């Protein structure tokens, strides 16, 4: 499956996203020829841009890594540690502390664009991916530092209804050939969002944060993909977004490119004039001189144009399912015995389409991997990442000791020699601590 990056270098933590693929250990999906072809294509795409889009070139260090073997091929040598040269490229093996995903990663003296092998050959997905991830490597240079923000509002019935309506209105705006129809659809999209912000006051800052990060990355990928049907493909992409089960970390992949393309039409110099603090929807409203209503009447009138009643019925049914899932997650990850791993400063990778907000406690990731000083915690079934990203919690019931550390239902802990699992704060809980030095 294709991968997308959710967040990259955040403070001292390296964060990446991935859609995990099943592969037998030792079965390589990486070869020099395909990696070289990807490097050449990425170079061609970023060279064609000539730094016009963001004022900096997206060309630079890139590596493609196989998650099964941790082997990689890169287009440049390392700075801190030389790599093995093989023709025009370089080879090596990534340490366990480096997450393998579609991401930007700081390692061996450079900031690299990293891609998971095999890189898709489907177009325009391949070109979009190459430029999306290349943008993440340079985003700090253009004043858009990587950041994360939880989106609990997008796990609620009202939040999901309003977002799905917004996606439909954005698709209609992009698809419209009549300027009046486009303007109306844009106003509708902004109405749905304004209505959501009234009900969830924290949502605007949180959504703006992710759209400046993943949204702009996806916009850049599409903008530089040289796809002659880019708008039509973006409309199809928004249609797929209407069917997403979890929006908490994936919504900006849909809204970001849509608002970016609409801004290209409404205000072609928006990227130059942007002060980086204003949200994309607010910038679009200002460019078009729109006054956006946020009341129930405006929401209902706009919603009637996008089958709001059908969406509301679907989301009411999903809300019942979601409540049952939240109760089960709380029972296993909050009320029951747990292993709590300290993850401040850790490296992460996770799947943005399998993220469930759990009230104020954080987010439950269906798939997540954390690498820290103590070792690696690999979770394939629900790990609770705290809101401040300091703790990763898994259900401890049924866990057993292994030679490497511990194994539980859907997770495995590999401990470095200086660390051990010890009893936690509550009876039945466990945590990870550095071993006490042996007595002399």
Residue ranges and their predicted role:
Residues 201-231, 238-300:
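Active-site-proximal alpha-helical
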Residues 115-129:
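Short pre-active-site segment immediately N-terminal to the catalytic Zn-binding motif
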Residues 272-440:
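Non-catalytic terminal regions of proteins
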Residues 141-199, 203, 207-233:
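Post-HExxH zinc-binding segment in Zn-dependent metallohydrolases
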Residues 89-109:
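Catalytic zinc-binding patch centered on the HExxH motif and its immediate surroundings
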Residues 128-140:
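Active-site recognition of the HExxH zinc-binding catalytic motif
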Residues 27-86:
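N-terminal mature-domain "stem" immediately C-terminal to a signal peptide or N-terminal signal-anchor/transmembrane
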Residues 11-21:
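Bacterial N-terminal signal peptides
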């Amino acid at each position: 499956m294709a991968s997308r990056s959710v967040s990259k270098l955040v403070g001292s933590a390296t964060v990446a996203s991935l859609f995990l693929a099943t592969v037998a250990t030792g079965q390589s999906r990486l070869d020099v020829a395909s990696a070289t072809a990807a490097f050449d294509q990425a170079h061609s795409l970023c060279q064609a841009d000539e730094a016009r889009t963001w004022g900096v070139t997206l060309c630079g260090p890139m590596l493609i890594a196989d998650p099964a073997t941790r082997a990689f091929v890169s287009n440049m040598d390392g700075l801190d540690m030389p790599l093995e040269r093989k023709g025009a490229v370089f080879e090596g093996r990534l340490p366990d502390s480096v997450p393998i995903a579609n991401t930007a990663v700081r390692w061996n003296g450079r900031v690299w664009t990293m891609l998971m092998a095999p890189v898709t050959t489907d177009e325009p997905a391949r070109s979009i991916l190459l430029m999306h991830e290349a943008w993440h490597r340079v985003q700090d240079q253009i004043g858009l530092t990587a950041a994360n923000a939880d989106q609990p509002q997008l796990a609620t019935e009202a939040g999901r209804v309003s977002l799905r309506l917004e996606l439909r209105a954005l698709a209609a705006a992009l698809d419209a050939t009549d300027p009046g129809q486009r303007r109306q659809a844009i106003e509708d999209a902004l109405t749905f969002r304004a209505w959501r912000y009234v009900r969830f006051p924290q949502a605007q800052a949180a959504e703006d944060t992710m759209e400046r990060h993943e949204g702009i990355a996806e916009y850049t990928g599409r903008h530089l993909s040289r796809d002659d049907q880019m708008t039509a493909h973006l409309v199809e992409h928004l249609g797929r977004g209407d069917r997403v089960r979890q929006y908490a970390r994936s919504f900006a992949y849909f809204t970001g490119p849509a608002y970016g393309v609409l801004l290209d039409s409404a205000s072609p110099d928006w990227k130059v004039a942007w002060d980086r603090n204003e949200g994309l929807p607010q910038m679009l409203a200002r460019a078009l001189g729109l006054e956006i209503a946020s009341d129930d009447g405006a929401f209902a009138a706009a919603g009637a144009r996008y089958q709001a009643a059908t969406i509301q019925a679907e989301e009411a049914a999903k809300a019942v399912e979601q409540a049952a899932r939240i109760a089960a997650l709380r029972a296993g990850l909050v009320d029951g015995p747990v292993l709590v791993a300290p993850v401040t400063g850790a490296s992460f990778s996770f799947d943005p389409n399998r993220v469930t907000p759990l009230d104020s406690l954080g987010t439950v990731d269906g798939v997540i991997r954390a690498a820290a000083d103590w070792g690696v915690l690999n979770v394939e079934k629900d790990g609770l990442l705290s809101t401040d990203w300091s703790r990763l919690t898994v259900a401890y019931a049924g866990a057993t000791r292994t030679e490497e550390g511990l194994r539980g239902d859907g997770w495995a802990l590999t401990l470095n020699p200086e660390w051990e699992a010890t009893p936690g704060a509550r009876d039945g809980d466990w945590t990870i601590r550095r071993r006490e030095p042996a007595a002399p």
